[in-house]
Amino acid sequence: MQIKFLTTLATVLTSVAAMGDLAFNLGVKNDDGTCKDVSTFEGDLDFLKSHSKIIKTYAVSDCNTLQNLGPAAEAEGFQIQLGIWPNDDAHFEAEKEALQNYLPKISVSTIKIFLVGSEALYREDLTASELASKINDIKGLVKGIKGKNGKSYSSVPVGTVDSWDVLVDGASKPAIDAADVVYSNSFSYWQKNSQANASYSLFDDVMQALQTLQTAKGSTDIEFWVGETGWPTDGSSYGDSVPSVENAADQWQKGICALRAWGINVAVYEAFDEAWKPDTSGTSSVEKHWGVWQSDKTLKYSIDCKFN
């Protein structure tokens, strides 16, 4: 099994030569549930910049995210993987209005990618054809918007993010075809994996998604990101998955660092704990505890990759 896995891995990653990039998913609310302002975002980014200068978000209009985060990211030299929430028409229209209002106030280079939807297919909020239509809608919209220096956002790719298992399902193909870039989410915790199997499961999920996308795009030379992955440090167990600082540290080294060593770009979920979230999602009480740092910016475990 290991020989077969390594052979498949080598085939999928033939074009990879360098360490994969690191990004962090970033929450937009304070511990008390209020929305972060420009100065708070600047503080977050100033703290993160020694580790990464790429952040990922989920919506444009919610909490005035682009209005406040855009200027902060530009001031701190960050790029945003900017999420756009497409699931209902009213929300989608608010997202488009925010893009039109606030993209002109920042430089085009501040936006790394527009990501239409976050697991919209996994949750069955949209069909693949509906998501494809909204991806194309955003492509058309941003072509007509210019940044503060007069350059068009047409140069910025428009993609989507979804769970790895949905992406390998043939039903997702219309959305994959419409997207310039597709990010794949994978959480060994939510698959009830034991710690002994967690990193192997992560690699297998990611490679299946990458191979599917390479086949769909007709090339091994594609931009690819793991859009979310991580391990909770507290809360209840889920099957054989046990939240703890030790297990999160282990998954960082054996999963996240190892993926990056193979040249896979990873957006970690998430930078900071989000204390405002509910104690339980109805499945497991881990929602507050995914951060690499506590909400007060105390590091929980080493994130230096140790290849020894």
UniProtKB/Swiss-Prot annotation:
Catalytic residues as annotated in Swiss-Prot or TrEMBL: E119, E228
GO molecular function, one term: glucan endo-1,3-beta-D-glucosidase activity
GO cellular component annotations of the record: cell surface; extracellular region; fungal-type cell wall
Cellular localization per UniProt: Secreted, Cell wall
Reaction catalysis annotation: Successive hydrolysis of beta-D-glucose units from the non-reducing ends of (1->3)-beta-D-glucans, releasing alpha-glucose
Name of one Pfam family that matches: Glyco_hydro_17
Signal peptide: 1-18
Glycosylated residues (UniProt): N197
Documented EC number(s): 3.2.1.58
Keywords recorded for this protein, A-Z: Cell wall, Cell wall biogenesis/degradation, Glycoprotein, Glycosidase, Hydrolase, Secreted, Signal
GO biological process terms held by the UniProt record: carbohydrate metabolic process; fungal-type cell wall organization
Uppermost EC category: hydrolase
InterPro entries per record: Beta-glucan_modifiers, Glyco_hydro_17, Glycoside_hydrolase_SF
Entry similarity comment: Belongs to the glycosyl hydrolase 17 family.
Protein's name according to its UniProt entry: Glucan 1,3-beta-glucosidase
High-level lineage: Eukaryota, Fungi, Dikarya, Ascomycota, Saccharomycotina
